[in-house]
Amino acid sequence: MKVVKLADIIGTNRDVDGGNWRSQRIVVESDGMGYSLHDTQIKAGTETHLWYKYHLESVYVIEGEGEVETVKDGKVWPVKQYECYVLDKNDEHLLRAKTDMRMVCVFNPPVTGEEVHDEDGAYPLPEHMKPLNS
């Protein structure tokens, strides 16, 4: 067993600033759990294009409100505190924060902890892993 304190992650290579967002990676690939767990903050008034081509993600909103638009069909999903949205089909999406948002994100497969989004809004797949849904 181990205990990870958020305060111990802030300011390390697991505390990643992506411009519109900042994410502290609490559990990562090297922890051997098969998923990663992130505490992510999104800035109010921003729109972020995301497309996790190699990862599935569940997002539990613990503060704030916004909306997620799935690019494929243009459907808009309002999300707010104490709601969870699940990107179970590698959905390309736009995240719009109406207010500052804080969320707990779970990724499968796990990230290493230092990733930032590429030009498509994706995290790279670790070389030794096979993509989900392939």
UniProtKB/Swiss-Prot annotation:
EC number per UniProt: 4.2.1.108
Pathway(s) of this molecule: Amine and polyamine biosynthesis; ectoine biosynthesis; L-ectoine from L-aspartate 4-semialdehyde: step 3/3
Catalytic activity: (2S)-4-acetamido-2-aminobutanoate = L-ectoine + H2O
Protein name in the entry: L-ectoine synthase
Keywords: Lyase
Keyword Lyase: yes
InterPro entries with a match to the protein in the record: Ectoine_synth, RmlC-like_jellyroll, RmlC_Cupin_sf
Function: Catalyzes the circularization of gamma-N-acetyl-alpha,gamma-diaminobutyric acid (ADABA) to ectoine (1,4,5,6-tetrahydro-2-methyl-4-pyrimidine carboxylic acid), which is an excellent osmoprotectant.
Species of provenance: Shouchella clausii (strain KSM-K16)
Pfam families (UniProt xref): Ectoine_synth
Top-level lineage group: Bacteria
GO term, biological process aspect, one: ectoine biosynthetic process
Family: Belongs to the ectoine synthase family.
GO MF entries: ectoine synthase activity
